[in-house]
Amino acid sequence: MVARNQVAADNAISPASEPRRRPEPSSSSSSSSPAAPRRPRPCPVVPAPAPGDTHFRTFRSHSDYRRITRTSALLDACGFYWGPLSVHGAHERLRAEPVGTFLVRDSRQRNCFFALSVKMASGPTSIRVHFQAGRFHLDGSRETFDCLFELLEHYVAAPRRMLGAPLRQRRVRPLQELCRQRIVAAVGRENLARIPLNPVLRDYLSSFPFQI
């Protein structure tokens, strides 16, 4: 009996040799102290946008707005409006053209809408087109006009003939544009409504009633 008890004692696992277990947190402690609710993060304050740094000044009246809008539509239809073309780009296109060739483009000056680039005897140059009190005039000139295209027609027909033929983006013009130009030149802008035409043709003539 003593021998068996001794063997049993030798084969037994002592309490000290057992792996220690980490104490687990009691459920009572977690339930008794619930986690505090998270506070919502404050929304970042977005600064108000500064006034837009626009190229053009604000219109002084609704009539000025209508006149510039009408002028822009006519420019889109004329064929020699080159949009945001730079001064250098305009002069390069005019350099090999005959004297008097011109084009209209957007002005880079903050106080002007448009600029006139023309091939002079001394080379290409650009002139600002001012719009003041509802009228157009060239920089350095006192002659004013209700319409930008009346200004261009004036300098095309002037004795000094400052302007010649416009530089169009498309060299070959459609036949209907050429016919319209001839009709306007023969009848006159003020008499277009008297021509016995159907409304479609009359609207087409009045869409660009100039001789340029």
UniProtKB/Swiss-Prot annotation:
Report domain SOCS box positions. 162-211
Which pathway features in its UniProt record?
Answer: Protein modification; protein ubiquitination
Q: Where in the cell is it found?
A: Nucleus; Cytoplasmic vesicle
**Keyword Nucleus on this protein?**
yes
* Annotated stretches, region: Kinase inhibitory region (KIR): 56-67
UniProt region (Disordered), positions on chain: 1-57
What GO molecular-function term can you cite, just one? Answer: protein kinase binding
Complex and partners? Interacts with multiple activated proteins of the tyrosine kinase signaling pathway including JAK family kinases, TEC, KIT, GRB2 and VAV. Binding to JAKs is mediated through the KIR and SH2 domain to a phosphorylated tyrosine residue within the JAK JH1 domain. Binds the SH3 domain of GRB2 via diproline determinants in the N-terminus, and the N-terminal regulatory domain of VAV. Interacts with the Elongin BC complex (ELOB and ELOC). Component of an ECS CBC(SOCS1) E3 ubiquitin-protein ligase complex which contains Elongin BC, CUL5, RBX1 and SOCS1.
Instruction: Quote the protein name from its UniProt record.
Output: Suppressor of cytokine signaling 1
